[in-house]
């Protein structure tokens, strides 16, 4: 086996191969033949599926500087060294079916990375540096132990496909609604009890899957007429305690995101002073940003600045920005034309989040 491996690598070096297949070789360490002398300067794609690797060499980028694809599916890799960030041409990295518990911040240095697959590992969190992957199009994080997603993920403005099925997520950051290129979002099999108010507002987002989030009972009305998967949602009894606000309509009780401070009703004709102040400040803030001649830096508390940059949501009737209070209106899925598509497999409702009693009274999902 060792002779055959050395021969394969030697031929690849001599003939300047661009692709090298070392799958199913029972390797428990990275082959030294790949790293000796100048390495394989011409190699672009390296496939090492179903081996027993536990880590990667520190000088990988130095010896294989032109790698565009690194396929390490089904190994025993526990950590990835910081040197991974030096693979400046890498476009595709697959570390699925390994034993990763931590993803090093240097992953954010892979400026050319388009596809990152980390399915079936032991990740509990992601470094915020992942937001630096400006070219990233596909991110698959299925079957990990993630309890949250970094807000900075919204900076991956090329991201088209995000999959976080079978994790431990109780919520997702509202900032993800700013992913302008996102076409498909899959969050099945988590612990979601609510979704961001603006989810589905982007026209680019066409496919959303939230199946088997048993406590999830409300879908933002922006998702109506999208392709949605919501089987197994809407448990009739709460399975775990949570501190989310909820509102009741008939026999239905729907949780709202944790950022919502209060819930208005059809009889609340006067907006809270804090909400009015934030809406006025937001208008000034937007005008300030549009004034190209203004060079004065904005000096505001971090939490306030983040809220102005990414409001709680936008009214589903008139698009007014909302910051503390929402006026919700329920449309049970079973009472819409979409009921036939789901055939009783879900008990969710569409929720229109409005900015005032006027919008609440005039919003109609089916018109």
Curated annotation (Swiss-Prot):
Keywords: Leucine-rich repeat, Repeat. LRR repeats lie at residues 16-36, 42-63, 66-87, 89-111, 112-133, 135-156, 158-179, 181-202, 204-226. SUPFAM superfamilies: L domain-like. SMART domains: LRR_BAC (SM00364), LRR_TYP (SM00369). InterPro entries: Leu-rich_rpt, Leu-rich_rpt_typical-subtyp, LRR-SigEffector_domain, LRR_dom_sf, LRR_R13L4/SHOC2-like. Pfam families: LRR_14, LRR_8. PROSITE patterns: LRR. This is Leucine-rich repeat-containing protein 28. It comes from Xenopus tropicalis. The lineage of its organism: Eukaryota, Metazoa, Chordata, Craniata, Vertebrata.
